[in-house]
């Protein structure tokens, strides 16, 4: 029992060592474990179930929009990868290569996919002839490999899970509209399911996806004041279509190149959930994404009728929420700590006195508030409570982000904020790449996005003092 107690309690305080706190939660909440391969992880059932719920939401939305799922090969021939110059240069440092099949050296190296634009383009070139074939709306769920130098579970790993959408369209307007439609869906995923507020915007030329005309992004802020790119949607223009000779006959019989979009979210969203919502007691899962939304803990379960009532309660609640009954022989106090550490949104306690009064006690994970409810209306009350918890977690995360969002007019202010008050910095920018590079060199901060909701906090660039063009969110990032 002492060992079990230590397992539950031994989490490094986040203010003492945020990185170790994060690692402790990943391991102790049984989300993932380290693999023997550097930079790779084993996603355990608790972690994978969160990803499955993300998948379910995204897949349902994509199918509502008319997308179809496909599966592309994991290998890309070297000649295919090199067809789009900017694209291959952007990924070259991260590519893993297969050079042998068994004992035989391959005639051509095969890249282990870092992303699949080249494969989709090769396929689209074969199947598209007319405007009547458009749009093509494909998506795949898979893993990709990027040989990262610095890794951390979920946030940056050599291999990770994602969905990648690849669509081609008749017109630029249709493709751009589709890119933004997907970005809006990602934003709703984060806010409506993960209780995580995001800033929507456009990446600068320096930060956009290799080979894209425009990259749109949703940016989130972690508890330690670092930014995290939660999802991206790219308008690739006709760059890839031309490189791969994808052409169609338009409505006038003229050959044209389709307009391409690609977009993705990954398992790094699980890392974001940990770092936005977690506390020193462990994980704190938003109810709508939590694999288990409520756990029933019988108190004095050895007493007559308690376990039977708890089982009856589980049967009732299982019709409306994802619920678990813990009837193990561990002490209730140990169970409270364990499920708090694992982030279960709602704990339901029921003991002999509760049964006498026809009631149960609901305990929220987010603020530990207790509420007594009648067993006659517990299905409704539990669902209402889960919605309250979601809204409260979203509001708390938004408040934390807003409190850590600052305005800088000069470089002196910028440097002072970045060193002493980690968070987002809103500052004006002239649009010159040299200023963007200098800000990163001096402060370690990168441009996160030019938000769609622009405002003017100054007339001049924070770096050079020249006339400003855009408001930019800046920050140090994962």
Curated annotation (Swiss-Prot):
<comment type="function">
    <text>Catalyzes the attachment of proline to tRNA(Pro) in a two-step reaction: proline is first activated by ATP to form Pro-AMP and then transferred to the acceptor end of tRNA(Pro).</text>
</comment>
<dbReference type="GO" id="GO:0005737">
    <property type="term" value="C:cytoplasm"/>
</dbReference>
<dbReference type="Pfam" id="PF03129">
    <property type="entry name" value="HGTP_anticodon"/>
</dbReference>
<dbReference type="InterPro" id="IPR033721">
    <property type="entry name" value="ProRS_core_arch_euk"/>
</dbReference>
<dbReference type="GO" id="GO:0005524">
    <property type="term" value="F:ATP binding"/>
</dbReference>
<dbReference type="GO" id="GO:0017101">
    <property type="term" value="C:aminoacyl-tRNA synthetase multienzyme complex"/>
</dbReference>
<dbReference type="GO" id="GO:0006433">
    <property type="term" value="P:prolyl-tRNA aminoacylation"/>
</dbReference>
<dbReference type="InterPro" id="IPR002316">
    <property type="entry name" value="Pro-tRNA-ligase_IIa"/>
</dbReference>
<dbReference type="InterPro" id="IPR002314">
    <property type="entry name" value="aa-tRNA-synt_IIb"/>
</dbReference>
<keyword id="KW-0963">Cytoplasm</keyword>
<dbReference type="Pfam" id="PF09180">
    <property type="entry name" value="ProRS-C_1"/>
</dbReference>
<dbReference type="InterPro" id="IPR036621">
    <property type="entry name" value="Anticodon-bd_dom_sf"/>
</dbReference>
<protein>
    <recommendedName>
        <fullName>Proline--tRNA ligase</fullName>
        <ecNumber>6.1.1.15</ecNumber>
    </recommendedName>
</protein>
<keyword id="KW-0030">Aminoacyl-tRNA synthetase</keyword>
<keyword id="KW-0648">Protein biosynthesis</keyword>
<keyword id="KW-0067">ATP-binding</keyword>
<dbReference type="InterPro" id="IPR004499">
    <property type="entry name" value="Pro-tRNA-ligase_IIa_arc-type"/>
</dbReference>
<dbReference type="InterPro" id="IPR006195">
    <property type="entry name" value="aa-tRNA-synth_II"/>
</dbReference>
<dbReference type="InterPro" id="IPR017449">
    <property type="entry name" value="Pro-tRNA_synth_II"/>
</dbReference>
<dbReference type="GO" id="GO:0140096">
    <property type="term" value="F:catalytic activity, acting on a protein"/>
</dbReference>
<dbReference type="InterPro" id="IPR004154">
    <property type="entry name" value="Anticodon-bd"/>
</dbReference>
<keyword id="KW-0547">Nucleotide-binding</keyword>
<comment type="similarity">
    <text>Belongs to the class-II aminoacyl-tRNA synthetase family. ProS type 3 subfamily.</text>
</comment>
<dbReference type="Pfam" id="PF00587">
    <property type="entry name" value="tRNA-synt_2b"/>
</dbReference>
<keyword id="KW-0436">Ligase</keyword>
<dbReference type="InterPro" id="IPR045864">
    <property type="entry name" value="aa-tRNA-synth_II/BPL/LPL"/>
</dbReference>
<comment type="subunit">
    <text>Homodimer.</text>
</comment>
<dbReference type="InterPro" id="IPR016061">
    <property type="entry name" value="Pro-tRNA_ligase_II_C"/>
</dbReference>
<dbReference type="GO" id="GO:0016740">
    <property type="term" value="F:transferase activity"/>
</dbReference>
<dbReference type="GO" id="GO:0004827">
    <property type="term" value="F:proline-tRNA ligase activity"/>
</dbReference>
């Amino acid at each position: 029992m002492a060992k079990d107690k230590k397992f539950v309690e031994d989490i490094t305080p986040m203010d003492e060592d945020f990185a170790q706190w994060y690692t402790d939660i990943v391991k102790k909440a049984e989300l993932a474990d380290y693999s023997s391969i550097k930079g790779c992880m084993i996603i355990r059932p608790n972690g994978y179930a969160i990803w499955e719920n993300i998948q379910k939401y995204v897949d349902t939305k994509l199918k509502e929009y008319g997308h179809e799922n496909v599966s592309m090969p994991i290998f890309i021939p070297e000649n295919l990868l090199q067809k789009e110059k900017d694209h291959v240069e952007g990924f070259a440092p991260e590519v893993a290569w297969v050079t042998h099949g068994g004992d035989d050296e391959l005639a051509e190296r095969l890249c282990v996919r870092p992303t699949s634009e080249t494969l989709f383009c090769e396929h689209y070139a074969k199947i598209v002839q007319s405007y009547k074939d458009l749009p093509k709306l494909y998506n795949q769920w898979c893993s990709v490999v990027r040989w990262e130098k610095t890794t951390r579970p979920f946030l940056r790993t050599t291999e990770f899970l994602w969905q990648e959408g690849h669509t081609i369209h008749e017109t630029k307007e249709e493709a751009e509209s589709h890119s933004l439609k997907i970005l809006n869906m990602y934003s709703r995923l984060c806010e409506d399911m993960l209780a995580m507020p995001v800033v929507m915007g456009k990446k600068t030329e320096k930060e956009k996806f290799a080979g894209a005309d425009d990259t749109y992004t949703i940016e989130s802020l972690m508890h330690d004041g670092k930014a995290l790119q939660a999802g991206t949607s790219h308008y690739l223009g006709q760059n890839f279509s031309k490189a791969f000779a994808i052409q169609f006959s338009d409505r006038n019989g003229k050959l044209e190149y389709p307009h391409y979009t690609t977009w993705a979210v990954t398992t790094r969203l699980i890392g974001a959930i940990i770092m936005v919502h977690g506390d020193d007691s462990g994980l704190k899962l938003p109810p709508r994404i939590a694999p288990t939304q409520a756990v029933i803990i019988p108190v004095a379960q050895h007493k007559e009728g308690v376990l039977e009532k708890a089982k009856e309660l589980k049967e009732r609640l299982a019709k409306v929420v994802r619920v678990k009954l813990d009837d193990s022989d561990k002490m209730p106090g140990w169970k409270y700590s364990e499920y708090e550490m694992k982030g279960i949104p709602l704990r339901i306690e029921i003991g002999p006195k509760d049964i006498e009064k026809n009631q149960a006690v609901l305990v929220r994970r987010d603020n530990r508030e207790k509420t007594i409810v009648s067993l006659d209306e517990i299905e409704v009350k539990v669902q209402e409570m889960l919605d309250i918890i979601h809204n409260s977690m979203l509001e708390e995360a938004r408040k934390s982000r807003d409190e850590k969002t600052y305005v800088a007019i000069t470089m002196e202010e910028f440097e002072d904020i970045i060193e002493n008050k980690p968070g987002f910095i809103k500052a004006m920018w002239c649009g010159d790449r040299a200023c963007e590079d200098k800000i990163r060199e001096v402060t370690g901060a990168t441009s996160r996005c030019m938000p769609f909701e622009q405002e003017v906090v100054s007339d001049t660039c924070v770096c050079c003092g020249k006339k400003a063009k855009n408001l930019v969110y800046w920050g140090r990032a994962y």
